């Protein structure tokens, strides 16, 4: 029995390595060259009115918890609900972030470039800390709060409660260590970035398959 437990622990550690590698490779592929979202002044009243009309349009989206949520048809301003969500969104749509969950280190800020280190730090909505700064999220002008991670019991109710408190849509995208590709495809659907989601999905799937193949040949 001890051997079985050890093998399971070894497999779990390997999956964690693969998941971390996938995110790292996605960061490298992205380059994070896009700047975070800024609300630039409109050059003409007509353009402003057109943009406002577009912002008011909505559609429905079914998140990974099975909740049907009314979301903006065009999403330009995102607040991540936690640290994993920040990492995933930095690879998927860095230009749309208006907050981050935790302060960046000097090395992270240098690597990412842009003004990410200057974005408001809003904490995490769920988990052990659950220290989301709701006032800062509201002040950021975020259109939506996006969480990522494992789908757990009671999550639907927690997400609904958070949505009521914030007054903006709150959705969750499941991220499994063995299938980050599916998360990127789901994000692509949500953000209207299907091509980008497919690109990152394919990249993660290829990286996962190759890494698992290599690690399977290493004696336990």
Region annotations inferred by a language model:
Residues 4-19:
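Bacterial N-terminal signal peptides that target proteins for export
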Residues 28-47:
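Bacterial lipoprotein signal-peptidase II cleavage site
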Residues 65-92:
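Conserved H-X4-D acyltransferase segment
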Residues 79-81, 98-101, 144-148, 170-174, ...:
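Structural recognition of the beta-strand scaffold that forms the well-ordered cores
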Residues 85-140, 144-151:
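A short, structured surface patch at a secondary-structure boundary
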């Amino acid at each position: 029995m001890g051997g079985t437990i050890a093998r399971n622990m070894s497999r779990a550690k390997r999956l964690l390595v693969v998941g971390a590698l996938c995110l790292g490779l996605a960061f490298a592929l992205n380059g994070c060259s896009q700047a975070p979202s800024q609300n630039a002044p409109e050059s003409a009243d007509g353009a402003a009115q057109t943009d406002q009309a577009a912002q008011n349009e909505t559609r429905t989206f079914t998140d990974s918890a099975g909740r049907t949520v009314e979301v903006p048809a065009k999403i330009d301003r995102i607040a991540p609900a936690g640290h994993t969500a920040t990492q995933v969104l930095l690879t998927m749509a860095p230009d749309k972030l208006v907050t981050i969950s935790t302060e960046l280190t000097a090395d992270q800020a240098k690597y990412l470039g842009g003004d990410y280190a200057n974005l408001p730090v809003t904490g995490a909505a769920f988990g052990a800390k659950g220290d989301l700064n709701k006032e800062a999220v509201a002040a950021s002008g975020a259109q939506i709060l996006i969480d990522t991670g494992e789908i757990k019991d009671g999550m639907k109710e927690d997400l609904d409660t958070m949505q009521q408190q914030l007054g903006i849509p709150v959705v969750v995208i499941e991220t499994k260590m063995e299938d980050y590709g599916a998360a990127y495809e789901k994000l692509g659907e949500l953000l209207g970035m299907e091509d980008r989601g497919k690109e990152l999905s394919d990249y993660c799937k290829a990286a996962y398959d190759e890494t698992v193949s290599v690690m399977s040949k290493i004696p336990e």
